[in-house]
């Protein structure tokens, strides 16, 4: 048997539905579109969100908020995630990328305080939450804020 001789098992495939090809196909004449009406016409379908002239949901709901142009998007790491590193190691953006803890850095790296840290580590990041600094110091580590 060759690769070009492989065929699906008998009964495993169905013939495709040939629409509008005469009465014998079972889908002739109206071609599964029913009788008349907008959806039976060529190009005839309502656009997404159209509710028959009623004010659509998207326009009934209020607009809310905005995104500041100066918004910074930090890569986030929690203190508990730093447990994977060996005691005494220096942790920076490169080390976190290699460990797969962050996907990439846009506007910097921020360390947050979720989880517990038991090892003394040197952590270099652009920002730290106050509690994250406390937890790193309590574990005997040091915090270094690097500029962008």
UniProtKB/Swiss-Prot annotation:
**Alphabetical GO biological process terms:** translation
Task: Print the keywords alphabetically.
Answer: Ribonucleoprotein, Ribosomal protein, RNA-binding, rRNA-binding
Where composition is biased (Basic residues), the residues are 30-39
Record's GO cellular component, any one? cytosolic large ribosomal subunit
Coiled-coil intervals in this record? none
> One Pfam family from the UniProt entry?
Ribosomal_L27A
This protein's source sits in the domain of life called Bacteria
What the entry lists under InterPro entries is as follows: Ribosomal_uL15, Ribosomal_uL15/eL18, Ribosomal_uL15/eL18_sf, Ribosomal_uL15_bac-type, Ribosomal_uL15_CS
Q: Which NCBIfam families match?
A: rplO_bact (TIGR01071)
Concerning its family, UniProt says:
Belongs to the universal ribosomal protein uL15 family.
Q: How does it assemble?
A: Part of the 50S ribosomal subunit.
- What role does it play? Binds to the 23S rRNA.
**Name listed for the protein in its UniProt record:** Large ribosomal subunit protein uL15
> Which gene codes for it?
rplO
């Amino acid at each position: 048997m060759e690769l070009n001789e492989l065929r699906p098992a008998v009964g495993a495939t169905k013939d495709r539905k040939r629409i509008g090809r005469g009465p014998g196909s079972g889908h002739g004449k109206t071609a599964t579109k029913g009788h008349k009406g907008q959806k039976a016409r060529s190009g005839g379908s309502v656009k997404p969100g159209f509710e028959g002239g009623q004010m659509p949901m998207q326009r009934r709901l209020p607009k809310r908020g905005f995104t500041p142009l100066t918004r910074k998007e930090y890569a986030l790491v929690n203190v508990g995630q730093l447990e994977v590193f060996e005691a005494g190691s220096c942790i920076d953006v490169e080390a976190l990328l290699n460990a797969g803890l962050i996907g990439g850095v846009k506007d910097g790296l921020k360390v947050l305080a979720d989880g517990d840290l038991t090892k003394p580590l040197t952590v270099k990041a652009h920002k730290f939450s106050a509690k994250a600094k406390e937890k790193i110091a309590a574990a005997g580590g040091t915090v270094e804020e690097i500029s962008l």
